From Swiss-Prot:
One of its GO terms (biological process) is lipopolysaccharide biosynthetic process. The record marks D140 as: Raises pKa of active site His. UDP-alpha-D-glucuronate binds at residues 393, 398, 432-433, 460, 492, 526-535, 613. This is Bifunctional polymyxin resistance protein ArnA. Bifunctional enzyme that catalyzes the oxidative decarboxylation of UDP-glucuronic acid (UDP-GlcUA) to UDP-4-keto-arabinose (UDP-Ara4O) and the addition of a formyl group to UDP-4-amino-4-deoxy-L-arabinose (UDP-L-Ara4N) to form UDP-L-4-formamido-arabinose (UDP-L-Ara4FN). The modified arabinose is attached to lipid A and is required for resistance to polymyxin and cationic antimicrobial peptides. CDD domains: Arna_FMT_C, Arna_like_SDR_e, FMT_core_ArnA_N. It catalyses: UDP-alpha-D-glucuronate + NAD(+) = UDP-beta-L-threo-pentopyranos-4-ulose + CO2 + NADH; UDP-4-amino-4-deoxy-beta-L-arabinose + (6R)-10-formyltetrahydrofolate = UDP-4-deoxy-4-formamido-beta-L-arabinose + (6S)-5,6,7,8-tetrahydrofolate + H(+). Residues 1-304 are annotated as: Formyltransferase ArnAFT. GO terms for cellular component: membrane. It comes from Shigella sonnei (strain Ss046). PANTHER family: BIFUNCTIONAL POLYMYXIN RESISTANCE PROTEIN ARNA (PTHR43245), UDP-D-APIOSE_UDP-D-XYLOSE SYNTHASE 2 (PTHR43245:SF13).
């Protein structure tokens, strides 16, 4: 049976050996180049492939159309993935008639995502396992073909558990691969209500927070012990690594992080005490705890800390242009919730951000980006991250004021982009789902979908092409001049503070705001061309969490990426949106203050938007880049978003002159 294999690490090697032992014909193997910053304690898939005479490749992006075509030419009957680190696109998965199967290091649906080996130890689990499952578009979500349980002993650390999982994986594959070969497998769907998902871990995630219980810190030490980077702490500015530890039920009134004794080296925790059995100062050698205490100059009563004592982290300065807008004000709230951001904002109004004006880490200037160019250039130079969120983004304006859309959305933003290039600042640019235009793909993909717009005499597309050209300019600056950038494409974000009812009164608002105004005023809900156009609606909280993770940029994974941010599960037509909104309105406690529902009315787009308008029938995002770069999934159901958005707007209405 012909197969193409995607593999890395020890699991990749044993998976390849198991396939060969089971009589599979491996046409090609795809793997990764080794990261020089990573301690390579595991087997080399590339070396194994070379020794076995199998073609092996390590492309940066295996999902590129050229690689998809090359894999198609191999005509695989089945595809296997053994610890390959990138998501494989649906186009590749569909190439194998017998399907694609992935080996995952947990008992799915628990511990989907990255680093399950480490996470089960961090969380103090007593059991894990390996799962072979069918691959689908969503990571680790396909039907289970086989599982094998593995007990986690109290003295297991990451490497011993890794060896146990490898042994279990060999057994699992020996039992299961012949059945797959003969088409004789029983698949069990995963229970979504039991699913848990965990993200990528970095060495910086393993600092010891002494206010936590000793058992929790001991589990952290176990989870990242050698050959992983190790759990760490600081004495003053001196970093040290803890390689092994023991939990002591020591009752002490000492502050967490205090040294209780140096022989043994015992540290007070939020609950109990942690004995540091072995450790290492800086880049030195491993030594026992009491010697480490001597090396670090510790005495009874000394204090350890999770961060260097004199290097308080400078807050990251974020410049948000259009800070009073829908995305800007919600993003400001999310950033200020953390203690390491300083937000600088500019906008022509401040009603949505009034709640932040007295915050010590929020700095606001009221002004227009077309006028305050010197202020903007100064703050681009001063800040670390720039988000130019100013744009005209309401469809009626595309036909009503196309030149103003071009001047603001393109020309003003191009100037800001050039400032970022000049001062070498990171830019996070709001592209738009509109750039996909009339694309016919089932899922709009950032890296593969064509961007299709209408003729020049349809000014409705001026917003789309302005944004698209800026995307291309930013990409070119990144390629040619090293601009650090991320492009994000929101798909129909909704929530409180989206537009306002006054904007809806002049037709310059998004769909849901216009529909709410119709309900508030007792006017018919207008369904443009019947309202059959489908969109994927995304809760603002989900969207902002993804955007926050782009700003955080863990491991620089977002650099040079284009990321759709939308909820493909929340697809509905505008008509269905209106019906859901109406149902929510009818049961709202303030309903009796408003006129009776005036019904739905179908209108032609030309009579509503004017000459030059074209609509898009569907717009559904692929979110594989968001999953890969951000470890992000949208979580909030559309009905909840509708209820909260409606409630917000109804409570802004002056009810003194409304019927009761």
């Amino acid at each position: 049976m012909k197969t193409v294999v995607f593999a890395y690490h020890d699991m990749g090697c044993l998976g390849i050996e198991a396939l060969l032992a089971a009589g599979y014909e491996i046409s090609a193997i795809f793997t990764h180049t080794d990261n020089p910053a990573e301690k390579a304690f595991y087997g080399s898939v590339a070396r194994l492939a070379a020794e076995r005479g199998i073609p092996v490749y390590a492309p940066d992006n295996v999902n590129h159309p050229l690689w998809v075509e090359r894999i198609a030419q191999l005509s695989p009957e089945v595809i296997f993935s053994f610890y390959y680190r990138h998501l494989i696109c649906d186009e590749i998965l569909q190439l194998a008639p017998a399907g694609a199967f992935n080996l995952h290091g947990s008992l799915l649906p628990k511990y989907r995502g990255r680093a399950p080996l480490n996470w089960v130890l961090v969380n103090g689990e007593t059991e894990t396992g390996v799962t072979l499952h069918r691959m689908v578009k969503r990571a680790d979500a396909g039907a289970i073909v086989a599982q094998l349980r593995v007990a986690i002993a109290p003295d297991d650390i990451a490497i011993t558990l890794h060896h146990k999982l490898c042994h279990a994986a060999r057994q699992l594959l020996e039992q299961t691969l012949p059945a797959i070969k003969h088409g004789n497998i029983l698949e069990i769907a995963q229970r979504e209500n039991e699913a848990t998902c965990f993200g990528h871990r970095t060495p910086d995630d393993s600092f010891l927070e002494w206010h936590k219980p000793a058992s929790v810190l001991h589990n952290m030490v176990r989870a990242v012990a050698d050959p992983w980077p190790g759990a760490f702490s600081y004495v003053g500015n001196q970093k040290f690594t803890v390689w092994s530890s023991r939990v002591h039920p020591h009752a002490s009134k000492a502050q967490p992080g205090s040294v209780i004794s140096v022989a043994p080296l015992l540290i007070a925790c939020g609950d109990g005490a942690l004995e540091i059995v072995t450790g290492q100062a800086g880049d030195g050698i491993t030594m026992q705890g009491s010697q480490l205490a001597q090396m670090l100059g510790l005495v009874q009563g000394s204090r350890l800390n999770s961060q260097p004592a004199c290097t308080a982290r400078r807050r990251t300065r974020v410049l948000i242009l259009g800070v009073n807008g829908f995305i800007g004000n919600h993003l400001t709230e999310r950033l200020l919730r953390e203690d390491h951001y300083e937000v600088y904002g500019l906008d022509i109004g401040s009603d949505a951000i009034s709640r932040f004006l007295n915050h010590p880490h929020f700095h606001f200037v009221e002004g227009d980006i077309s006028i305050h160019s010197e202020w903007i250039e100064y703050h681009v130079k001063k800040c670390d991250v720039v988000l130019p969120l100013v744009a005209i983004a309401t469809p009626i304006e595309y036909t009503r004021n196309p030149l103003r859309v071009f001047e603001l959305d393109f020309e003003e933003n191009l100037r800001i982009i050039r400032y970022c290039v000049k001062y070498r600042k990171r830019i996070i640019f709001p592209s738009t789902s509109e750039v996909y235009g009339m694309c016919s793909d089932k899922y709009f993909d950032e890296d593969h979908s064509n961007l299709i717009v209408g003729p020049v005499n349809k000014p409705r597309w001026i917003y789309s092409v302005s944004k698209q050209l800026l995307d291309r300019v930013i990409w070119a600056y990144g390629e040619k001049e090293g601009l650090q950038f991320t492009l994000f494409r929101p798909f129909n974000w909704m929530g409180p503070r989206l537009d306002n009812l006054n904007a809806a009164r002049i037709g310059s608002s998004r769909a849901i705001t216009q529909l709410i105004l119709n309900l508030v005023e007792g006017s018919p809900i207008k369904l443009i061309d019947g309202g059959k156009q489908k969109r994927c609606f995304t809760d603002i909280r989900d969207g902002i969490e993804a955007l926050y993770r782009i700003i955080e940029n863990a491991g620089n994974r977002c650099d040079g990426e284009i990321i759709n941010i939308g909820n493909p599960e929340n697809e509905a037509s505008i008509e269905e949106l209106g019906e859901m909104l109406l149902a929510s309105f009818e049961k709202h406690p303030l309903r009796h203050h408003f006129p009776p529902f005036a019904g739905f009315r179908v209108v032609e787009s030309s009579s509503y938007y004017g000459k030059g308008y074209q609509d898009v029938e569907h717009r559904k995002p692929s979110i594989r880049n968001a999953r890969r770069c951000l470890d992000w999934e949208p979580k909030i159901d559309m009905q909840e978003t509708i209820d909260e958005t409606l409630d917000f707007f109804l409570r802004t209405v002056d009810l003194t002159d409304k019927p009761s």
